[in-house]
Amino acid sequence: MASTFNIPCNAGTIKNFNNSQRNLGFSSNLGINFAKTRFSNCGDSGRIPSQLVVRASERRDNLTQQKTGLSIEECEAAVVAGNAPSAPPVPPTPKAPSGTPSVSPLSLGRRPRRNRTSPVFRAAFQETTLSPANVVYPLFIHEGEEDTPIGAMPGCYRLGWRHGLVEEVAKARDVVVNSIVVFPKPDALKSPTGDEAYNENGLVPRTIRMLKDKFPDLIIYTDVALDPYYYDGHDGIVTQHGVIMNDETVHQLCKQAVAQARAGADVVSPSDMMDGRVGAIRAALDAEGYSNVSIMSYTAKYASSFYGPFREALDSNPRFGDKKTYQMNPANYREALIETQEDESEGADILLVKPGLPYLDIIRLLRDNSDLPIAAYQVSGEYSMIKAGGVLKMIDEEKVMLESLLCLRRAGADIILTYFALQAARCLCGEKR
């Protein structure tokens, strides 16, 4: 067959057809035989005309059809005469099982299943994607040298900050997970006012400095809250009557955020749910010269029962009462808009919903009402349920894991904090390689 190319009239003169490949810029792997190149209306000038007709070579590297033995010219003549070589027959329509009723086709103007018939179609029309860039890896750290397993979270450990943590971060980076969030377990350093939270030589600042030294481009999120440092396990300072003090707690949180930023944190993440903390932290960071440090606010953090394994990991269960006076009621929907508006006005850079999968409607609500990036936290209870189901062979752990993360993305999450980050990224990279 012949192919026609439109080319500029002022192209250089062809001195030798054997050099046409170089002059015209065609690569040799195109299967074009330039010895059989036919130029139309060249005249005697030797100049390349504005229209070039090129015949394909008879060579085919991957030809699987049976050869007819005819030349290209003979094949073309046969087609013109209506004697084209026969193509494979149309495959027969699959037979229905015996007993299938005979019915007239439904009169449907649209059949959505047509766009699902092929893996190629399904991939082309996929609306939501998931990649390692969409996940943030939460990591638990402690002062010890050894990595200790967390019983309620299979596959998760309290990592020794000098060795185990570095190894885990290196594994994550191997599969393009370059964002982490660290949660400390400062065993014997709890106090009534959580002062260890802003100790610049404390576990978290030391860890940040070490990681930034080893992995300068690593994005480090930090947790801003007092519960790991407060002996009663609450996220704020508590009065003698068990009341969580808001403004006094915010004062401590500002010092904690500045200490983390000074150590090199990229994103500070207040998870305490105190009123006004985002604006106060933003002002404190800016005053200290850290205007480029982002704030990911736990905007809609619910008083959920899905946090149990996490609290075991950090030994941060409340010693009395619960956290319902500052975390949101799981029954509430519109309240999330109030928190969204407040956090946006106070200078938040990222809005987070926690937990994740049980609160897809809240993720979508924030996505539809804010232009800021939305984060979702697939919390410890969600992780442990999937792990347990996989161990008991009740579900396919890998497929459910990936589906759950894809659902969070579909609901509107730009990034997902998930303990599956490393496992999921390995699966995703394996699928694409």
From Swiss-Prot:
UniProt: 5-aminolevulinate 2 binding residues: 380, 419
Localization per record: Plastid, Chloroplast
Binding site for 5-aminolevulinate 1: 311, 323
Residues of the transit peptide: 1-56
GO molecular function terms attached to this record: porphobilinogen synthase activity; zinc ion binding
Any one annotated GO CC term: cytosol
Region described as Disordered: 83-115
InterPro entries: ALAD, ALAD_AS, Aldolase_TIM
Cofactors, names only: Mg(2+)
EC main group: lyase
E.C. code: 4.2.1.24
Descriptive protein name: Delta-aminolevulinic acid dehydratase, chloroplastic
The organism's taxonomic lineage, starting at the top: Eukaryota, Viridiplantae, Streptophyta, Embryophyta, Tracheophyta
